[in-house]
Design a protein with these regions (language model features):
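Short loop/turn segments that flank or connect secondary-structure elements
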Residues: 1-193
Length: 193
């Protein structure tokens, strides 16, 4: 029905894998995305890209006139997830839950999570999701304790560049590249592990 593709405001946050998929699938740069379908916002002091809704219905820019997704194969993780949600346990993991009243489409049928998400290597993907969530949580804490505003701003821009603006090598495994960047970022801002 595509109701979840309309009126979402700036809530469709994009993670590094989403940007990787979009830039690879659309054969463009992060800057190209910023000039067309992505915008930046500050959330809890963290610079985050999100999908930029368009028109009077505030719809996803990739929703076609028939109400179908033009980028379904490379759609963002939050779009893949809906109407599921994630509950993070605080110990490095998470569980899925079904938002039973959020999706208006009927009838609903049982689908395995790995099939619903439609990602290859579900274990590696879930590991990435957890790592990214907990890294952001730790980074917010560390950056929140720094009193020098100019340094905090510099570190936020560093993270934006490292995880989003700096192109990923499409000939190399995304997860390995992300891991390398994650370790670099942790070291740079002083997160253990």
């Amino acid at each position: 029905c595509s109701d979840c593709c309309r009126g979402m405001g700036n809530s469709i946050f994009l993670d590094p894998m989403d940007i990787y998929r979009l830039t690879t699938g659309l054969e463009c740069t992060f800057e190209d995305l910023l000039s067309t379908c992505v915008e930046l916002q500050v959330v809890d002091g963290f610079i985050q890209p999100n999908m930029k809704m368009t028109g009077k219905e505030e719809q996803c820019p990739f929703l076609n006139e028939k109400g179908r997704c033009n980028i379904h194969a490379i759609r963002p993780g939050i779009c893949r997830l809906f109407p599921l949600g994630r509950c993070y346990d605080g110990e490095g993991g998470f569980q899925y839950f079904l938002q039973i009243y959020e999706c208006k489409k009927e009838p609903k049928s049982k689908v395995k999570i790995k099939n619903w998400l439609g990602v290859e290597e579900i274990g590696r993907y879930e590991n990435f999701v957890a790592q990214w969530h907990y890294f952001q949580k730790d980074a917010r804490k560390v950056l929140g304790e720094i009193s020098q505003e100019a340094l905090v701003k510099k570190l936020h821009l560093y993270l934006l560049t490292l995880f989003y603006q700096k192109p990923y090598d499409v000939k190399r495994d995304f997860y390995n590249q992300f891991e390398q960047r994650l370790q670099e970022a942790k070291q740079q801002i002083g997160i253990a592990g």
